[in-house]
UniProtKB/Swiss-Prot annotation:
Predominant localisation class: secreted
Name of the molecule in the record: Probable outer membrane protein PmpF
Keyword field: Cell outer membrane, Cell wall, Membrane, Secreted, Signal, Transmembrane, Transmembrane beta strand
Cysteine disulfide links: none
Secreted keyword on record: yes
InterPro entries: Autotransporte_beta (IPR005546), Autotransporte_beta_dom_sf (IPR036709), Polymorphic_membr_middle (IPR011427), POMP_repeat (IPR003368)
Ranges of residues in domain Autotransporter: 755-1034
CC per GO annotation: cell outer membrane; extracellular region
Pfam families on file: Autotransporter (PF03797), Chlam_PMP (PF02415), ChlamPMP_M (PF07548)
SUPFAM superfamilies: Autotransporter
Region (Disordered): 664-709
Membrane topology: Peripheral membrane protein
SMART domains named in the record: Autotransporter
Organism: Chlamydia trachomatis serovar D (strain ATCC VR-885 / DSM 19411 / UW-3/Cx)
Length: 1034
C-alpha cells in the first residue's frame, strides 16, 4: 500500500514555464510558486485528506527474510502520484514504507513524487535504495517538495549522519531516456538537496528538459566543517562522477543552495554532448563552520576535475555566489572545450569570483572555444576590506606545489575569449624555494596552441565603468611563475587594459599576432622577458578622439621586494639586460585583427599620429638595435584596400615618476594608471626631457600614515607616423560582381523570352506553359563566375487578321536563384515580363516579326565574408527589350521539310535602382552606366508536319549569334564603413555564340501540346531554356 493524496489539475501546456523562465531567473522568486505547468497541465498543490490508494504495476522481487527487496514500477499508461507520505522506518524512503535493494521505474507515463517526508537518518525524502535507483524511458518525472531531515542528532562528531537526498538517495542513480525531469523545492539535512548517491549519478538522453530549482541542503551538526556535510544543493555524488550527457532539451539549475556546490557537488563533474542551452543561475554555496569558511563553488564543486565539452547550445553561469571561493566553479582543474557560446556573468565569491582551482594533482586546464565566444564579465570578489569590495578577479589558485599544472587558452576561427575581468594567474611555482621561478618551468600557459586556433584571446576593460577602474587602482591582469607562449591566432590587449608578465618569459611565434589597442599596456616585471615577433597596433580605435596609443613598458617598480606598506620601494633602473626583445615587423590592424586598409577610412592623409610607445628605466632593457629589429617601415605586402605610404619616426623623451607602496584604495591618486595619465605633457616636436610634476605619495584611505617613496626616470620612445594615400584596390570578394552579373542575366532572360515569341498558324489561340532557364557563367580573368536556375510560367493569347497579320500578347513570371562559384554570395529574384508580338507578311514570301517587352525584377541579395560576417540588400531592376526578325519563307523545300533562312536583331537595356546594403561590410551601389546589348542571330529554320491525325510537327533553328553592340553595366560602389570606392561591372562575356532551338508539338482538333528547347553556347557562357505546355487553338 502507498499513502497518496491527489493534486488538483487544470489544463495548460508543459512545464517549460519553469525552464524557460530561468533565462530571467533573477527576476523570478521561485519561493512564491504555488502552481506551475507540468505534462500539459497546470498543477496547484492543494492537499486532500490522506487516503490509501492501491498502486498500479508495482512489482517486488528478490524478497529477503528481513523484508528487503527490489522494487519495479513499469508500464503505467496513466499518471502515477506518490504524495504526502511520512516515513520514520529505518532504511526506507519517504514515499515507500519498505526497504529496497534497488528501485527501477521504466516505460511509465508521468510520475509525480510530491510532499513526501523522511525523518530517519538514512535519507531519501521520496525514495531510498540500498543499491541503484533507475528511472528509464518515462514521460514527465517530477519530484516536488520532498524532504529528508529531522533525525535526532547525537553529538558534535556524528559523521554518520545520513539525512541525504531530499528526493533520492542510493548507491548509484541513473536517469536515462525520460521526456522531462524536474526537481523542485526539495531539501535534505545532509548532502544532495534533491539527489544524493554514494558513487555515480548519470543523467542522460532526456528528450525535452531538465530542471533543478530551489533545492536546498541544511546541516545543523555543530561540526567545524559543516559545509562538507551539506554539499550539493541539488545533486551530490559523494565519491564519484556526476555525468549530464546527451540530453536534447534545456538544462537548468536555478536558485539551489548547498554548503559546498550550490547546484552540484561531486568528485568529478562532466557535462557533455548536450544539444540545448545549459543554465546555472542564482545558485549559492553558503556553508558555515566554527572556524574558517570553506563554502566553495557557487554552482559546482568538485574535488578533482570539471569538464564542459561538446555542448551545442549557449551555456550560462550567471549570478552564482560562494561565501568562500569559486563563485561559479570550485574544482581541481577545468576542461572547457568545443561548446557553443559560454558566459560567466555576475558570479561572486570572497576568492575567485569565477574559479577556485585546488590543484589536487598534475593537470592541464583548458579554456577553448567551440562554435561561439567565451565571455567573462562582472564576476566580483567581496572582502571585509571595503576598499577592495567590488573588484573583478576571475581566479583563485591554491598555493600547493603541483607539477606540471598548465593552462591552455584557445580561440578557434572567428571566435574570441573575452576577459573583461582581471585574469591573474599565480601560485603555480614548481618549487616555492625558486625565486625567481625557473624560465623552463613545466607549469606553462599556452595561447592558441594549434593551427585550428586562429581566433583571439582578448584582455579588455571595455565593460568596466570608470568607478570600477578607479577602484582597481594598481590591480591589473598578470601572469606569474608560468612561462607563456603565444603560438597561433591573436592575443589582444584593449580598452586601457594592462597585462603584466612577472618573473617569467613571454614568447611569441611568428605565426601569431600580439595586438595592442587604445590605452593598452603590456608590462614586463623584474626577471621577466618579452620576445615579440609580430606586433600589431589596432589603429581605428587609437584614432578616435580621447583615445591614447598603447604602451610596452618595463615596470619601474621592483615587485619582488619592498612592496609592503611603509617600505621604501625599489626600482628596476639597475637592470641593464634586455627585457623587451623585438624580432619582427609592426603591423597596422583593425578591430578584427585584420588588415586595416580595407576596414577603415584612410582616404585622407594623417600627420603626426602617435601609435605606440615603449618605456624603460634603463637603456640596456632594449636591444641596442631594437629599432631595426622592430620593422616599423609599415610596408605591407601587396594588399587590397587603400594604397599609400607610411612615414614613421621615433621620438624619445624622459620623465620622472614617484614610486609608492600605497594601497589600491580609490583615494590613492598615485597608482600606475594615474601616473600614466597625469605625469607627462607631450608634443611630437618635444625631444627634450618633459617637465614632470613630482607626484607625492598619498596617505590613502584616510589612515593618516604616509608611505615611503622613491623617484625613477622613465625613458619613453614614441612612434609617430604620417600617412599619404594614393588610391584604393577592392578585394574581389567585396567587389559585387554578382550585382552586375544579375543585370546581364536580366537581359539574357529578355533575349530568351523574345526568341520564343513566334506566332503559329492558328486563327486564335490561348496558350500556357511552364518554363525553366539554366545558366552557367565561367570565371574569366579575376571576375567570379556563377550559376543560376529559374522556373516559372507563361501565358499568351494570339489572334490573326484577314491578311495574314498576327498579334500575340504574352505575360510570364519566374523566380530565379543565382550563386557565385568562388564565394557563397547568392541572389534570389522574381521577374515579371510582358510582351507584345506582331507578324506582318510581305510579298507572300517574307515575314517580318517584331516584338517589344518589359521585364521588371525584384532582387534579394546576400553576401558572405568568412563564416560570421554577411550583408544583405534589396533592389529592383527594369529591362526593356525589342526584336525584329525577318524570315524568307516558301523557298527551300527539301522533300517534306521546309528550310527557311532568317535573320533577327535582339535589343535589351537593363537599369537597376540604387542599392544600399545592411550588415557587415555594407555597400552602396549607384548606376553609372546601364547594361545595353544588341545581338543578331543569323541562321536557318527547318520545319516538318505530318499529314496524320493528330498532327505531329517538328521545328529546329540553328544560328550564329554575334554581338553587334555591347555596353557593360557600370555601378559606382562605396564600402560604407571606410568610404572606399570602385566601379563594379560584370564578368566579361564572349562576343560570339551559337544558338539552337528545337520544338515539338502534337495537335488535336482544338488542343495543342508542345515542348520547346533553346540553347546558347559560348566560350564564357552556356544557357538552357525549356518551356512546355498546351494551347487551345481555333
Amino acid at each position: 500500500m502507498i499513502k497518496r493524496t491527489s493534486l488538483s489539475f487544470a489544463c495548460l501546456s508543459f512545464f517549460y514555464l519553469s525552464t524557460i523562465s530561468i533565462l530571467q531567473a533573477n527576476e523570478t522568486d521561485t519561493l512564491q510558486f504555488r502552481r506551475f505547468t507540468f505534462s500539459d497541465r497546470e498543477i496547484q498543490f492543494v492537499l486532500d485528506p490522506a487516503s490509501l490508494i492501491t498502486a498500479q504495476n508495482i512489482v517486488l522481487s528478490n524478497l529477503q527474510s528481513n523484508g528487503t527487496g527490489a522494487c519495479t514500477i513499469s508500464g503505467n499508461t496513466q499518471t502515477q502520484i506518490f504524495s504526502n507520505s511520512v516515513n520514520t522506518t529505518a532504511d526506507s524512503g519517504g514515499a515507500f514504507d519498505m526497504v529496497t535493494t534497488s528501485f527501477t521505474a521504466s516505460d511509465n507515463a508521468n510520475l509525480l513524487f510530491c510532499n513526501n517526508y523522511c525523518t530517519h537518518n538514512k535519507g531519501g525524502g521520496a525514495i531510498r535504495s540500498g543499491g541503484p535507483i533507475r528511472f528509464l524511458n518515462n514521460q514527465d518525472v517530477l519530484f516536488y517538495n520532498n524532504i529528508s531531515a529531522g533525525a535526532k542528532y547525537v553529538g558534535t562528531g556524528d559523521h554518520n549522519e545520513k539525512n541525504r537526498g531530499g528526493a533520492l538517495y542510493a548507491t548509484t542513480i541513473t536517469l536515462t531516456g525520460n521526456r522531462t525531469l524536474a526537481f523542485i523545492n526539495n531539501m535534505s539535512g545532509d548532502c544532495g538537496g534533491a539527489i544524493s548517491a554514494d558513487t555515480q549519478i548519470s543523467i542522460t538522453d532526456t528528450v525535452k528538459g531538465i530542471l533543478f530549482e530551489n533545492n536546498h541542503t541544511l546541516n545543523h551538526i555543530p561540526y567545524t566543517q559543516a559545509e562538507n556535510m551539506a554539499r550539493g544543493g541539488a545533486i551530490c555524488s559523494r565519491r564519484d562522477l556526476c555525468s549530464i550527457s546527451n540530453n536534447s532539451g534545456p538544462i537548468v539549475f536555478n536558485y539551489n543552495q548547498g554548503g559546498k556546490g550550490g547546484a552540484i557537488s561531486a568528485t568529478r563533474c562532466v557535462i557533455d554532448n548536450n544539444k540545448e542551452r545549459i543554465i546555472f543561475s542564482n545558485n549559492s554555496s553558503l556553508g558555515w563552520s566554527q572556524s574558517s569558511s570553506a563554502s566553495n563553488g557557487g554552482a559546482i564543486q568538485t574535488t578533482q576535475g570539471f569538464t564542459l565539452r561538446n555542448n551545442k547550445g549557449s551555456i550560462y553561469f550567471d549570478s552564482n555566489t560562494a561565501t568562500h571561493a569559486g563563485g561559479a566553479i570550485n574544482c581541481g582543474y577545468i576542461d572547457i572545450r568545443d561548446n557553443g557560446p559560454v558566459y560567466f556573468l555576475n558570479n561572486s565569491a570572497a576568492w575567485g569570483a569565477a574559479f577556485n582551482l585546488s590543484k589536487p594533482r598534475s593537470a592541464t586546464n583548458y579554456i577553448h572555444t567551440g562554435t561561439g565566444d567565451i565571455v567573462f564579465n562582472n564576476n566580483v570578489v567581496f572582502t571585509l576590506d571595503g576598499n577592495l569590495l567590488g573588484k573583478r578577479k576571475l581566479f583563485h589558485i591554491n598555493n600547493n606545489e603541483i607539477t606540471p599544472y598548465t593552462l591552455s587558452l584557445g580561440a578557434k576561427k572567428d571566435t574570441r575569449i573575452y576577459f573583461y575581468d582581471l585574469f591573474q594567474w599565480e601560485r603555480v611555482k614548481e618549487n616555492t624555494s625558486n625565486n625567481p621561478p625557473s624560465p623552463t618551468s613545466r607549469n606553462t600557459i599556452t595561447v592558441n596552441p594549434e593551427t585550428e586556433f586562429s581566433g583571439a584571446v582578448v584582455f579588455s576593460y571595455n565593460q568596466m565603468s570608470s568607478d570600477i577602474r578607479t577602484l582597481m587602482g594598481k590591480e591589473h591582469n598578470y601572469i606569474k611563475e608560468a612561462p607563456t607562449t603565444l603560438k597561433f591566432g591573436t592575443l589582444a590587449i584593449e580598452d586601457d587594459a594592462e597585462l603584466e608578465i612577472f618573473n617569467i618569459p613571454f614568447t611569441q611565434n611568428p605565426t601569431s599576432l600580439l595586438a595592442l589597442g587604445s590605452g593598452a599596456t603590456l608590462t614586463v616585471g623584474k626577471h621577466g622577458k618579452l620576445n615579440i615577433t609580430n606586433l600589431g597596433v589596432i589603429l581605428p580605435i587609437i584614432l578616435k578622439e580621447g583615445k591614447s596609443p598603447p604602451c610596452i613598458r618595463v615596470n619601474p617598480q621592483d615587485m619582488t621586494q619592498n612592496t609592503g606598506t611603509g617600505q621604501t620601494p625599489s626600482s628596476t633602473s639597475s637592470i641593464s639586460t634586455p627585457m623587451i626583445i623585438f624580432n619582427g615587423r609592426l603591423s597596422i590592424v583593425d578591430e578584427n585583427y585584420e588588415s586595416v586598409y580595407d576596414s577603415m577610412d584612410l582616404s585622407r592623409g594623417k600627420a603626426e599620429q602617435l601609435i605606440l610607445s615603449i618605456e624603460t628605466t634603463n637603456d640596456g632593457q632594449l636591444d641596442s638595435n631594437w629599432q631595426s629589429s622592430l620593422n616599423t617601415s609599415l610596408l605591407s605586402p601587396p594588399h587590397y584596400g587603400y594604397q599609400g605610404l607610411w612615414t614613421p619616426n621615433w621620438i624619445t623623451t624622459t620623465y620622472t615618476i614617484t614610486l609608492n607602496n600605497n594601497s589600491s584604495a580609490p583615494t590613492s591618486a598615485t597608482s600606475i594608471a594615474e601616473q600614466k595619465k597625469t605625469s607627462e605633457t607631450f608634443t611630437p616636436s618635444n625631444t627634450t626631457t618633459a617637465s614632470i610634476p613630482n607626484i607625492k605619495a598619498s596617505a590613502g584611505s584616510g589612515s593618516g600614515s604616509a608611505s615611503n617613496s622613491g623617484e625613477v626616470t622613465i625613458t619613453k620612445h614614441t612612434l609617430v607616423v604620417n600617412w599619404a594615400p594614393v588610391g584604393y584596390i577592392v578585394d574581389p570578394i567585396r567587389r559585387g560582381d554578382l550585382i552586375a552579373n544579375s543585370l546581364v542575366h536580366s537581359g539574357r532572360n529578355m533575349t530568351m523570352g523574345l526568341r520564343s515569341l513566334l506566332p503559329d498558324n492558328s486563327w486564335f489561340a490561348l496558350q500556357g506553359a511552364a518554363t525553366t532557364l539554366f545558366t552557367k557563367q565561367q570565371k574569366r580573368l579575376s571576375y567570379h563566375g556563377y550559376s543560376s536556375a529559374s522556373k516559372g510560367y507563361t501565358v499568351s493569347s494570339q489572334a490573326s487578321g484577314a491578311h495574314g497579320h498576327k498579334f500575340l500578347l504574352s505575360f510570364s513570371q519566374s523566380s530565379d536563384k543565382m550563386k557565385e562559384k568562388e564565394t557563397n554570395n547568392r541572389l534570389s529574384s522574381r521577374y515579371y515580363l510582358s510582351a507584345l508580338c506582331f507578324e506582318h507578311p510581305m510579298f507572300d514570301r517574307i515575314a517580318l516579326i517584331g516584338a517589344a517587352a518589359c521585364n521588371y525584377g525584384t532582387h534579394n541579395m546576400r553576401s558572405f565574408y568568412g563564416t560570421k560576417k554577411s550583408s544583405k540588400g534589396k533592389f529592383h531592376s527594369t529591362t526593356l527589350g525589342a526584336s525584329l526578325r525577318c524570315e524568307l519563307r516558301d523557298s527551300m523545300p527539301l522533300r517534306s521539310i521546309m528550310l527557311t533562312p532568317f535573320a533577327q536583331a535582339l535589343f535589351s537595356r537593363t537599369e537597376p535602382a540604387s542599392i544600399r546594403e545592411s550588415g557587415d561590410l555594407a555597400r552602396l551601389f549607384t548606376l553609372e552606366q546601364a547594361h545595353t546589348a544588341v545581338v543578331s542571330p543569323i541562321g536557318i529554320k527547318g520545319a516538318y508536319s505530318s499529314d496524320t491525325w493528330p498532327t505531329l510537327s517538328w521545328e529546329m533553328e540553328l544560328a550564329y549569334q554575334p554581338t553587334l553592340y555591347w555596353k557593360r553595366p557600370l555601378l559606382n560602389t562605396l564600402l560604407i564603413q571606410n568610404n572606399g570606392s570602385w566601379v563594379t561591372t560584370n564578368t566579361p562575356l564572349a562576343k560570339h555564340s551559337f544558338y539552337g532551338r528545337g520544338s515539338h508539338s502534337l495537335k488535336f482538333s482544338h488542343l495543342k501540346l508542345f515542348a520547346n528547347y533553346q540553347a546558347e553556347v559560348a566560350t564564357s557562357t552556356v544557357s538552357h531554356y525549356i518551356n512546355a505546355g498546351g494551347a487551345l487553338v481555333f
